[in-house]
């Protein structure tokens, strides 16, 4: 399974075990406490799927306070050298063949039509080879909220989905 995966940064044992458990799953939740390396595990998971030729695009939806931190984290932890990283409101997404393409977006943007439109275009074109990562998934705990509905609808056709949180959800969005 992941035993031949070459990490760029050495994982702690709990991170290695988390990757082993979730690596091949279509849908998986990384429920790990704050500061235990959920982001690194998710990046390794995306890179492993890319190396298996299962994905070429990753959408990261994260709170405004952290979504741009993903740029530094991807560069720090990704063993894939051919990266194309785009952040919503900074870069427009331009797919690069032969690269692992990352698109980072603030979760708040998905409460608005403009943010939804950007992700619709990406998901329509790359859904069969795409992974969606929802960082701090508790931001969609209310299934009747517009943002939650938009994220669930956009994620439906995507092949691989991951949610990350250090806090359990009080209301299930499903």
Stretch-by-stretch model annotation:
Residues 1-30, 35-148, 153-157:
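SF2 helicase/translocase NTPase motor core
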Residues 161:
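Short aromatic/hydrophobic "clamp" motif used to bind/position activated sugar donors
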Residues 165:
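Conserved phosphate-coupling serine/threonine residues in phosphotransfer and NTP-handling enzymes
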Residues 168:
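Active-site segment of extracytoplasmic enzymes that catalyze sulfate/phosphate-ester chemistry
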